[in-house]
Amino acid sequence: MLGKYVRVRVTRPMHSFDKEKNLSYDLNFGTVESGIDAHSPVKGAYIMGVTHRVRVFEGRVIAVIKRKDMGGIFLVVAPKSKRFIIHQIEDAVRFAEEEGTYEISCLYESSCGAIVYRIINGETRFLLIKNKRSANWGFPKGHIERGENEKETAYREVLEEAGIRIRFLPDFRFRSEYSIQGKIEKQVVIF
């Protein structure tokens, strides 16, 4: 379902109040009209990346929320041009979804890391880390955590994975984008 384009008919516009649930909607919320199977367990969709009330919205599914206490799932939909990662989505739906009561799958992931090297006897040596989940080797990197910027993430990840404190080279920043198994769209920034 991640990455699909859907049409949402808004039933609860942003800033509306549901007296029955005692809930003020920070996002537009509605039912999915098209883009998914008619027998899908989708119970509704939150719309991110739109800062005004809308009646109908067509966008891309960027997250799937599955509540632990009940059947069905909720989608998070955004304009194609917008990218939101897990902590941004969790913050946006916090008005309706209590932390720890759901599982979330996201379309987008963002990681940061660094090319760590040192020169010994005129020879440049690079630090590579073996990924535990695969046979791949790479530079130390990891997901951006809530409240971090890219450089803070890179610094923390190198320290956690290698126990090394690093200095950044001025004006070096490389960004790579790729797809993981055709399901997750990942962006990696390396310093």
Task: Tell what function each PLM region has.
Residues 105-139:
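N-terminal strand-loop-strand
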Residues 1-107:
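Hydrophobic N-terminal alpha-helices or hydrophobic patches in metabolic proteins across all domains
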Residues 159, 163-191:
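Active-site segment of metal-dependent pyrophosphate-handling enzymes
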Residues 148-153:
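N-terminal phosphate-binding loop and adjacent alpha-helix
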Residues 134, 145, 163:
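A contiguous binding-surface segment within folded domains or other stable secondary-structure elements
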